[in-house]
Amino acid sequence: MLFFLCFYKGFCTINPEEDPNNIVDEMLFEIRAVQREYAIKRELIFLHLQQANSLLQNAKTTDEKVDLLIQKDAFSTELEFLKNSELRDISKIRYIKGLQIIKLLYEKTLSLDHHFAAVSTLRDVNNISNPNNYPEFVEMKDKLKTTQDKRTGFDLPSLLNSNIYTSVVYSFVSMFTNTNTSKAEKDNGLKEVECILDFTLRMHNDLNTIYFETAFLQKKNENISEAIKDLFKEYTKPLGYTIGLEECRKGDDWDAIRKNLDTYLATLDKTLEDNSKLDAARNLQINLEFPVDRLLQFITEYNNFINEGVNFYEKFQIMLSSYENEKQCASKTPVEYSRLKEGISVTIEKFNTAYKPVEINGSKMKQLLYGINEYD
């Protein structure tokens, strides 16, 4: 059967930019294939049952009637077996595809962490938001210090000297009160740093906001990552698999899960063959099915986080684009600023494509998890 060829694809290497909705569609296709296959088998048995009923009505001898009743009972038993076998095959599909989704979403959280780390480096944000990190401003301060009146001037303590606001105020006060520097020298000095001061004073708060809110998103991503680890532990527990998701990924131990699943399914198949153990078989099937509420809860949590991330980064994009004198001060604007803008644009695109939410509506989820078709 075609769908069985796809069963173990979820254990192969996954690209973190793969769309989880493709996995959902594959799951839906495979479940429908199973349902069609078993529907054909049931139709054949129902046809045999109808024939047996027709023959039973016309049977004249006791032996004929007994034989036909035995046939009917065998057909009913076969129908029950088909029902349990169908549940078993659908449960297997759900389990493997669910594990594939878990694995993919974990890869996405790891990839997201790299994006956040690239934006939220405090050193980089501090470098472009504080004029004290610009050589031109440092040079101007040094000149003011060497030309100031030693009797009336004063030096800022190192702590205040590194502060953007006290450092700028001190520099302006020193410049205006410095009688050893000509007006032309002061004008030239201001001209050298005007774009630096304009950019840092206007963008300092916005850049810090971007840093701290990105750190907040990074923390939430860590929480999502921990939640999916817990889900994986709960998910593989019925198979007797005890290794955590992170260790499984690092050790590429997916084949061990496949072997545990094969063993579990072999036990289920053996139990299904014994009519006296149908309740036990049903329990084994239930344990293999998706932990529905837990999985739905996580998918909802992941989707909300991605949507929140898009909103945050679109706000960052607006904040960075709000610098009014960007064209006028293009030659003095730090290259890190342009890189930050580009990085945020790329991240927005990533959120909308590589990290986009898992689109599972109510009717689709019912069919995927319970085999219920809204058109049945």
PLM regions with names:
Residues 1-376:
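Extracellular, luminal, or virion-exposed ectodomains of exported proteins
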